[in-house]
UniProtKB/Swiss-Prot annotation:
Name the record gives this protein: Zinc finger matrin-type protein 5
Superkingdom of source: Eukaryota
Matches recorded under SMART domains: ZnF_C3H1
A Pfam family matched in the record: zf-U1
One GO location term (cellular component): nucleoplasm
Cellular compartment(s): Nucleus
Example GO BP: RNA splicing
C3H1-type ZnF: 51-79
Keywords: Metal-binding, mRNA processing, mRNA splicing, Nucleus, Spliceosome, Zinc, Zinc-finger
PROSITE patterns the record matches: ZF_C3H1
Record PANTHER family: NUCLEASE-RELATED, ZINC FINGER MATRIN-TYPE PROTEIN 5
Signal peptide: none
Region entry Disordered, spans: 150-170
Organism, as annotated: Homo sapiens (Human)
């Protein structure tokens, strides 16, 4: 039993020898599968350019199907599809330009930012115009009485939960 060659494009295997491999790699099924694979990674601008240069496929327009599929010499896109594709190309172009035109942020470190923030907060007046409001905990409407709630849904006690000195988790 000899080695076997597996073609990822066609999802099939065959006996690996020079004749069989050449025959497969030059075969129509392999070439179609390879084209479909690489077409998945084409950008919208290249697809739009190709589709605009093609004439509409009559069979696809009449029946909605074409025997040639993605290998057809004619376009299977409607005018609306072409418009949507051109809008997508324009948006991608704008996004690339925006990234190039956007000013780069200066390299900074967290420590520098924290120092500036501390200085800003210390220089700010300590008395604020608005007093700090504390929020009052309220249970949602329609819940059962507090005594019937499980501990995980009850409000924390006023001062927080007491610390347990020797608690083991696990």
């Amino acid at each position: 039993m000899g080695k076997r060659y597996f073609c990822d494009y066609c999802d099939r295997s065959f006996q690996d020898n020079l004749h069989n491999r050449k025959k497969h790699l030059n075969g129509l099924q392999h070439l179609k599968a390879k084209k479909v694979w690489y077409d998945m990674f084409r950008d919208a601008a290249a697809i739009l350019l190709d589709e605009q240069n093609k004439r509409p496929c009559r069979k696809f327009l009449l029946t909605g199907q074409c025997d040639f599929g993605s290998n057809c010499r004619f376009s299977h896109m409607s005018e609306r599809d072409l418009q949507e594709l051109s809008i997508q190309v324009e948006e991608e172009r704008r996004a690339r330009e925006w990234l190039l035109d956007a000013p780069e942020l200066p390299e900074g470190h967290l420590e520098d930012w924290l120092e500036k923030r501390a200085k800003r907060l210390s220089s700010a007046p300590s008395s604020r115009a608005e007093p700090i409001r504390t929020t009052v905990f309220q249970y949602p409407v329609g819940w059962p009485p507090v005594q019937e709630l499980p501990p995980s849904l009850r409000a924390p006690p006023p001062g927080g939960w007491p610390l347990q000195p020797r608690v083991q988790w696990g």
